[in-house]
């Protein structure tokens, strides 16, 4: 059976944390900031953790990632 490969697109978007979680960055941050408040733009800059519902699926895609 061949070795499982890391899903490269996912590997670029997620980083593994020290406790084994997955860190992600937020969507809606590339353009059209005039419709967003300063508070919303500031909060979008922060990283976030992958939700519990998505974690299992994403973990399989980046299983071999360090």
UniProtKB/Swiss-Prot annotation:
Return the Pfam families for the record. Answer: Ribosomal_L35p
Which Gene Ontology cellular-component terms appear in the entry? cytosolic large ribosomal subunit
Keywords from the named record:
Ribonucleoprotein, Ribosomal protein
PROSITE patterns, alphabetically?
Answer: RIBOSOMAL_L35
Q: Where is the composition biased (Basic residues)?
A: 1-16
SUPFAM superfamilies attached to this UniProt entry: L35p-like
Q: Which GO terms describe its biological process?
A: translation
Q: Which InterPro entries match?
A: Ribosomal_bL35, Ribosomal_bL35-like, Ribosomal_bL35_CS, Ribosomal_bL35_sf
Q: What GO MF terms are annotated?
A: structural constituent of ribosome
- Disulfide linkages recorded for this protein, renumbered to the chain, are none
Segments carrying the region annotation (Disordered) are 1-21
Under PANTHER family, the record lists: 54S RIBOSOMAL PROTEIN BL35M, LARGE RIBOSOMAL SUBUNIT PROTEIN BL35M
Family according to the record? Belongs to the bacterial ribosomal protein bL35 family.
| Protein's UniProt name | Large ribosomal subunit protein bL35
Its source organism is Lactococcus lactis subsp. cremoris (strain MG1363)
């Amino acid at each position: 059976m061949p070795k499982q490969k890391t899903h490269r697109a996912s590997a670029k978007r997620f980083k593994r944390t020290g406790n084994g979680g997955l860190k992600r960055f937020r969507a809606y941050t590339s353009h059209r900031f005039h419709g967003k408040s300063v508070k919303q733009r500031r909060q979008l800059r922060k990283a976030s953790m992958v939700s519990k519902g998505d974690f299992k699926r994403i973990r399989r895609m980046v299983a071999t990632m360090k």
